Amino acid sequence: RRINNDCQNFIGNRAMYEKVDWICKDCANIFRKDGLLNNCRSNCFYNTEFLWCIDATENTRNKEQLEQWAAILGAGWN
């Protein structure tokens, strides 16, 4: 299991991290594009690939919650 070092608040928020990371994993499995998984995870999910993957995995109804969780995990960049 890979730990995203960009996420300052991973410890204590593992369940939250796994939910956000699942978006990137699912997106990478759907599109099989080289580098997509790492790009989606970069900057603790604060990037355009993550937002694109939310839409691509049909999770737009949860977009606000997913962005909030990413902000909590990466506290300091938002």
From Swiss-Prot:
Keywords, ordered alphabetically: Disulfide bond, Hormone, Neuropeptide, Secreted
Superkingdom of the source species: Eukaryota
Alphabetized Pfam families for the sequence: Crust_neurohorm
Tissue: Produced by the medulla terminalis X-organ in the eyestalks and transported to the sinus gland where it is stored and released.
Chief location of this protein within or outside the cell: secreted
Assigned GO CC terms: extracellular region
Gene3D superfamilies tied to this protein: Crustacean CHH/MIH/GIH neurohormone
Keyword Kinase: no
Localisation: Secreted
Family note: Belongs to the arthropod CHH/MIH/GIH/VIH hormone family.
Protein function: Represses the synthesis of methyl farnesoate, the precursor of insect juvenile hormone III in the mandibular organ.
PANTHER family for the chain: ION TRANSPORT PEPTIDE, ISOFORM C (PTHR35981:SF2)
Protein's name according to its UniProt entry: Mandibular organ-inhibiting hormone 1
Species name: Cancer pagurus
